[in-house]
Amino acid sequence: MRNILAVSLVLTAVLAAAIAAPRAASPSSDYTIQAIRYAELPDFPLSELVVGGPQGEKIDIAMVIWLIRGEGRNILFDSGFHRQSWFKYFPMKDFLQPDEAVKLAGVQPEEVTDIVISHAHWDHMGGIDLFPKATVWIQKEEFRYYTGEAWQAGGHHGGIDPEDVQELVRINTEGRLRLVDGDNQEILPGIRVFTGSRHTYASEYLLVSGAKPFVLASDNCYLYRNLEKHMSSATFSEADHQANIQNQARMIELAGSADRVVPGHDALQFQRFPSEGRIAKIR
């Protein structure tokens, strides 16, 4: 009788624990990931991408947005740009406006359901107005800083377009903005964002889970060379270089392999993964 009672108590405890435990995140094995190159920026100084890199060396960098499809959603990681004012500073080659670029992958601009913004720089947040029905996700601290303190005395807003900031505020007033509160947050089933790299005030990178998880780094890791040489990307301040390097190691750990960390501006992603035209099939 005592044995039966003991077994009953154990089974009851196990059942209670199972009910109380949070549901596991979706494995999201059905998510596909495509890199879409919407432009190329030629002859860019390598030393501005790899801190401590060789002076005088220049490379052509890819301007990229990433399309993630699954769970009934069309998700963009970053939105590119289109404002003419930036072309005089950064003469692009082979430019195709981001809303036109996603059509090459079979998605209409109004079919984009979500845009996850890695950071507020002009070439990553500058296309949010091109996708009229998308919910936009950005770190709460990134939003707070670049809609306020960045423009005060002592603030830093290099690379931030005031028109993009105004657009972000407008999207918020429309109810289409979601503010992410910090590190290691699942914002959609199987989609997590992580902070700590400090490319900007509160930049984030993205993990797409599944049997073979992938990390999309955006500018938190510009190039494969950053990963291979353990060298920092540009950061909010020089004091953040070490945190950037540490987060590159974290990206590899999250992805399970350096081969599944996709840098933000490296044209090699279109060679390392099956590609056709402007589109590389990451997964």
What residues fall within each predicted segment?
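Positively charged n-region of N-terminal signal peptides that target proteins for export
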Residues: M1-I4
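Metallo-beta-lactamase
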Residues: A18-V107, E111-D123, E141-T195, A211-N220, G256-R260, ...
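Active-site metal-binding loops of divalent metal-dependent hydrolases
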Residues: Y38-A39, S79-H82, A120, E141-E142, ...
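Short, conserved loop/helix-junction motifs that constitute active-site signature segments
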Residues: D129-P132
